Curated annotation (Swiss-Prot):
Covalent link Tryptophyl-tyrosyl-methioninium (Tyr-Met) (with W-93), residues: 242-268
Protein residues bound to heme b: 283
Phylogenetic lineage: Eukaryota, Fungi, Dikarya, Ascomycota, Pezizomycotina
Natural source organism: Pyrenophora tritici-repentis (strain Pt-1C-BFP)
Record cross-link Tryptophyl-tyrosyl-methioninium (Trp-Tyr) (with M-268), residues: 93-242
UniProt KW Ubl conjugation keyword: no
UniProt-recorded name of the protein: Catalase-peroxidase
Gene name as annotated: katG
Cofactor note as given: Binds 1 heme b (iron(II)-protoporphyrin IX) group per monomer.
InterPro entries: Catalase_peroxidase (IPR000763), Haem_peroxidase (IPR002016), Haem_peroxidase_sf (IPR010255), Peroxidases_AS (IPR019794), Peroxidases_heam-ligand_BS (IPR019793)
Subunit structure: Homodimer or homotetramer.
Composition skew (Basic and acidic residues), residue ranges: 213-226
Length: 760
């Protein structure tokens, strides 16, 4: 070895490291979320069918094993009071509780608590241990039970094991195997921060963000006056599931805390009674943990050494577990029966007066003004404590609306139980979608309004000859094909893959509020629905019946067939919901801000139009190629929401051609913004200066963004005209059937098999 030569072999850096595109261009349009639907990310393979696996599950044996686990305390993580029930309730609650009704994202639907960022949130400290306690059971039952189902079912079993009968349980949540990058959790850069979601929020804390005295070291005597929580967020702080249990920004004001609670739980689709029941019911079990300040804990699981094998927050205080556990920084046991359902939470809340104190970790909490020591110690049977509560607990008494509800429950505990188990069931199942996805022997018979129920099909479905007849009749009904296409799209594209709401089934496009949404062009919609109802009435006078939901989709499909000159698959079986089956207020959250496929809407100062388009495509469960081909096809079909010519880059509108891409990528065009908003653009011939087209940001992004342009170029090629039509038809069918969970598990993709009966 020559002198000066490094004795250590040079090792190159590795893939994925170094300065990334997002470092150079932090505001670039990110299409990575459209790649989350790639089945290659699933180690179980693209043909894995969780529904079929779940049907093989010995459900009773699983519940028996979970019941046994509740009291099988492990030395490496001992059970409080000898029972893991409180821990597992928190695990299930924090899995499902990330759901927000605004965009349907979050929730426990695919087991995201296992991945970043949720697995490292300050509010999820110690849940790494809860999931590890479950691993032997998950390993035993394997593919028959997903992590997503198991975490929530375990919370249910925990309640039952402590004397709280539940409302039921439905399985059917298939696991994902990667972090969901689509969810906007907030713009704060420090744990427990709120300075982005609130106009005058706090910066947050350094270190690992365990909630203790850190967050209110800056003297604040009054709660913040601006509590307008940023949309679509529900949590009050970065890294919390709900609200700050110490009070707004750590200020122990129960009345102010009630405001945050109402906002947060409201955005989870819970009313005041459901909110109060969840807090009271959840806090009837277990305890919080704040044995010492957070300086005693190590990094979160994602930041820890390999030797910890996914564990985080290693605790150097005392034994590091049991009585020395540090989780939230609060040290509260709410009732004298922490492993048994009772009404003692409310009894104590109203029996005692409360005074502020500091936990051993320095957090604000409340202790009863009494000499009674009636609360058991979690690990020493000879020790008793005074009752304690959180600031958010006192809100259940101090807020007038909550106080009215909870005082009644003090005298009528059965009403509390009924409200709690229903709210708990809703919490766990709000993002499950239609009942056709619900699996298992404990699915409740009672149909609930928040399910967005649709009637079950009755009688024989329409067959091939019926479909052919109806296609002819809808095309002869005097409605322009473009209007039929727009209406079918409007009906089906209300679907949200996040919480499986919306879609064409139910024909809710004819009901409030969807019939009045601007994007659905109410005047035109009424015209189309009237014509289709006429066709339906005539057909239904015979022996077979067709739902309006099916007819809306069939009419759009027939119009696409006419424009494409190829057969477009159609699968009947939809039914029509009633207004009474529709929670209009809840459905308001499904109204789109933009729909780039119909060239509708525009961005804001905070979010660009094209970012909203990618967001919409993700909610529709589309890939980038599907987003591109569907947009180009809808433009060629003249399907803009208002019939405008923006982006209709063709001399033959109404025909399914690739003209949109050919003309968008024409080098002879020069585009200029029509005004300072840069939402509308005009395309000029470079030589003559003649204006040829107008376009919006919805259109021009496909020529500007490198990845989207690469796909657009593919469809603009002379040898891909047939591919364009084929891919558009496949994308159309996908949109029309996004909510058809009743058929998705019965067959593979239609495009791989051709049109099989009764699909046409």
């Amino acid at each position: 070895m020559s002198q000066g030569e490094c004795p250590v072999k040079k090792v190159p850096n590795v893939a994925g490291s170094g300065t990334r595109n997002t470092d150079w261009w932090p505001n670039e349009l990110r299409t990575n979320i459209l790649r989350q639907h790639d089945p290659r990310q699933n180690p179980l393979g693209p043909d894995f069918n969780y529904v079929e696996e779940f049907k093989k599950l010995d459900y009773d044996a699983l519940k028996k094993d979970l019941n046994a686990l509740m009291t099988d305390s492990q030395d490496w993580w001992p059970a409080d009071f000898g029972h893991y029930g409180g821990l597992f309730i928190r695990m299930a609650w924090h899995s499902a509780g990330t759901y927000r009704v605004t965009d349907g994202r979050g929730g426990g639907g695919d087991g995201q608590q296992r991945f970043a960022p949720l697995n490292a949130w300050p509010d999820n400290v110690s849940l790494d241990k809860a999931r590890r306690l479950l691993w032997p059971i998950k390993q035993k039952y394997g593919n028959k039970i997903s992590w997503a189902d198991l975490m929530l079912l375990t919370g249910n079993v925990a309640l039952e094991s402590m004397g709280c009968p539940t409302f039921g349980f439905a399985g059917g949540r298939a696991d994902t195997f990667q972090s969901d990058e689509s969810v906007y959790w907030g713009g704060e850069t420090e744990w427990l921060g709120s300075d982005v979601r609130y106009a005058d929020g706090a910066k947050g804390v350094k270190g690992e963000g365990i909630m203790d005295g850190d967050q209110h070291k800056t003297d604040k005597s009054e709660p913040h006056t601006s509590r307008n929580l940023e949309q679509p967020l529900a949590a009050a702080h970065m890294g919390l599931i709900y609200v700050n249990p110490e009070g707004p920004e750590g200020i122990p004001d129960p009345v102010a805390a009630a405001h945050d609670i109402r906002t947060t739980f409201g955005r989870m689709a819970m009313n005041d009674a459901e909110t109060a029941a969840l807090i009271i019911g959840g806090h009837s079990f277990g305890k919080t943990h704040g044995a010492a300040p957070s300086e005693n804990t190590g990094p979160d699981p994602n930041s820890e050494d390999l030797a910890t094998q996914g564990f985080g927050w290693m605790n150097k205080h005392g034994r590091g577990n049991g009585p020395d556990t540090i989780t939230s920084g609060l040290e509260v046991t709410w009732t004298g029966t922490p492993t048994k359902w009772s009404n003692k939470y409310l009894e104590y809340l109203y029996k005692f007066e409360w005074e502020l104190e500091k936990s051993p970790a320095g957090a604000n909490q409340w202790v009863a003004k009494t000499d009674e020591h009636i609360i058991p110690d979690a690990y020493d049977q000879n020790k008793k404590h005074k009752p304690r509560m959180l600031t958010t607990d006192l809100a259940m008494r101090m807020d007038p609306a909550y106080e009215k509800i909870t005082r009644r429950w003090l005298e009528h505990p059965q009403e509390l139980h009924d409200t709690f188990v229903r709210a708990w069931f809703k919490l766990l199942h709000r993002d499950m979608g239609p009942r056709s996805r619900w699996l298992g022997p404990e699915v409740p018979k009672e149909v609930l309004i928040w399910e967005d129920p649709v009637p079950q099909p009755e009688g024989e479905l329409i067959g091939e000859s019926d479909i052919a007849t109806l296609k002819k009749q809808v095309l002869d009904a005097g409605v322009e094909p473009a209007k039929l296409i727009r209406t079918a799209w409007a009906s089906a594209a209300s679907f949200r893959g996040s919480d499986k709401r919306g879609g064409a089934n139910g024909a809710r496009i004819r009901l409030a509020p969807q019939k009045d949404w601007e994007v659905n062009n109410p005047k035109e919609l009424a015209e189309v629905l009237k014509a289709l109802e006429g066709v339906q009435s005539k057909f239904n006078s015979g022996s077979k019946k067709v739902s309006l939901a099916d007819l809306i989709v069939l009419a759009g499909t027939a119009a696409v067939e006419k424009a494409a000159g190829v057969q477009v698959p159609f699968t009947p079986g939809r039914t029509d919901a009633t207004q009474e089956q529709t929670d209009a207020k809840s459905f308001e959250h499904l109204e789109p801000v933009t729909d780039g496929f119909r060239n509708y809407g525009k961005g804001t100062d905070r979010v660009r139009t094209e970012q909203l388009d990618v967001d919409k495509a993700h909610l529709l469960r589309l890939t980038a190629p599907e987003m591109v081909v569907l947009t180009g096809g809808m433009r060629a079909l003249n399907a803009n929401w208002d019939g405008s010519s923006h982006g209709v880059f063709t001399k033959r509108p109404g025909q399914l051609t690739n003209d949109f891409f050919v003309n968008l990528l024409d080098n002879n065009l020069e585009w200029k913004a029509a005004d300072s908003s840069k939402e509308l653009y005009e395309g000029f011939d470079r030589k003559s200066g003649q204006k040829k087209w107008t376009a919006t940001r919805h259109d021009l992004v496909f020529g500007h963004h490198p990845e989207l342009r690469a796909v657009a170029e593919t469809y603009a090629q002379a040898d891909n005209t047939d591919k364009f039509v084929k891919d558009f038809v496949a994308g159309w069918e996908k949109i029309m059937n996004n909510d058809r969970f009743d058929i998705k598990n019965k067959s593979v993709s239609a495009q791989s098999r051709g049109a099989n009966k009764p699909r046409l």
